[in-house]
Amino acid sequence: MSKNVLFALTAFSLVACTTTPSEPPKNTEHWATLISKQENLHQVDNKFYRSEQLEAQSEALLNKLNIHTIVNLRFFDRNDDKQAFGHTKINLINTPLLTWSISPEEVADILWQIKQHQKNGAVLVHCYHGADRTGLIVASYRVIYQNWDLNEAKREMQQGPYGYHSVWKNIDNFFTQENMAKIKAELDKRSNTTK
């Protein structure tokens, strides 16, 4: 084989292995607003924030944002919030979700807690990376409380700058009209028992 043919084949192989960077998503002005890239911290609305697991040095930022409650979705290492913020007046709630097995009832419970605690101030929800479980809760919040279209909420979760991991197919598959109806029914039950 001539050197030119070998060179051409090598060059072609290298080009074939490269990927074209995808264009950034469009029409995203209604998505959560970046507050701090370091903490993957975003503002969803005036009383709701999302982030990764925060550390003690984030306390001043939480105070500045008037965050009164942190909802921790982590199943493992659940005490990190207590170690970082246990000395503060921030209300710490632990509602662990197993990434690979999430039920509509669990999501309804978390959304209920978020809504109840928003009466006292802003709420921050997080998991370890602030991407997958957090994304599922934020997308569900968007659909249930903000009346977003299911596909748009899912698009924000998957394509937003939060670090979503597409390996969690069960999270992708969670977003059905049936599951959203189950969440709404569970929330309606809770509303009726507190009246």
Locations of regions flagged by a protein language model:
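Short cysteine clusters
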Residues: 127
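Substrate/cofactor-recognition hotspot
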Residues: 130
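Sec-dependent N-terminal signal peptides
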Residues: 5-14
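Cys-dependent protein tyrosine phosphatase-like superfamily
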Residues: 17-123, 136-195
